């Protein structure tokens, strides 16, 4: 296995991890944002909204059809805490080019798809689709309630919130149910402008 960090352009770095043992390639875009109470819930929704549709694929079915044409590529999104930062991660996984018959690189097509979803979102006049926002807010609330119902996870989260009361790290990574309900995530915020530099891309 080999690793290499490459400066792709100003403010963007790529981490390339090469390992012939794996049959798939994953491309991840990682955005580090300041962890703040006033927008933790809104930020947490962003990767899920962005990977559910795009300007070129305005519906979930259209996006799924595109993924099926890429040999069943898979999109994933997550929100984590990393110190006093909120980490938003969006990933696409595809079969490695070694195992395809297409003349055009499958990894290249997958990278372009993910880039399009992130930087050319399904937004009109600066606002996301209302249906997309409602759906992801509902899923986020279900996720938060699920963690509350899971005693070990709830106890761990409560311990962290008490230990780090005076620090941003004490905030829940996705906010609370009340925060999600009140969030104004309908407004599109260009991640490249609000995240800490550098934007980190991981290719494995």
Task: Report each predicted region and the residues it spans.
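Acidic/histidine-enriched alpha-helical segments
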Residues: 64, 120-144
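Glycine-rich, charged/polar anion/phosphate-binding loops
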Residues: 12-16, 187-190
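M16 family metallopeptidases and their MPP-like homologs
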Residues: 15-17, 23-43, 60-116, 153-175, ...
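Non-catalytic alpha-helical coupling and interface elements of nucleotide-dependent molecular machines
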Residues: 51, 72, 116-119, 123, ...
């Amino acid at each position: 296995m080999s690793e290499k960090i490459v400066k792709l352009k100003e403010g963007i770095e790529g981490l390339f991890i090469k390992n012939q043992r794996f049959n798939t390639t994953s491309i991840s875009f990682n955005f580090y944002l300041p962890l703040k109470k006033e927008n933790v819930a809104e930020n947490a929704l962003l990767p899920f909204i962005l990977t559910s549709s795009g300007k070129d694929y305005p519906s979930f079915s259209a996006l799924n059809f595109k993924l099926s044409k890429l040999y069943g590529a898979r999109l994933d999104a997550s929100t984590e805490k990393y110190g006093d930062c909120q980490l938003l991660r969006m990933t696409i996984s595809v079969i490695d080019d070694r195992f395809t018959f297409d003349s055009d690189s499958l990894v290249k097509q997958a990278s372009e798809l993910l880039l399009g979803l992130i930087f050319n979102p399904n937004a009109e006049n600066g606002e996301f689709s209302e249906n997309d926002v409602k759906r992801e807010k509902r899923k986020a609330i279900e996720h938060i309630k699920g963690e509350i119902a899971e005693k070990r996870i709830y106890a761990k989260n409560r311990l962290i919130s008490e230990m780090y009361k005076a620090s941003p790290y004490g905030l829940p990574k996705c906010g609370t149910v009340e925060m999600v309900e009140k969030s104004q995530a309908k407004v599109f915020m260009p991640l490249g402008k609000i995240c800490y530099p550098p934007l980190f891309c991981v290719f494995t």
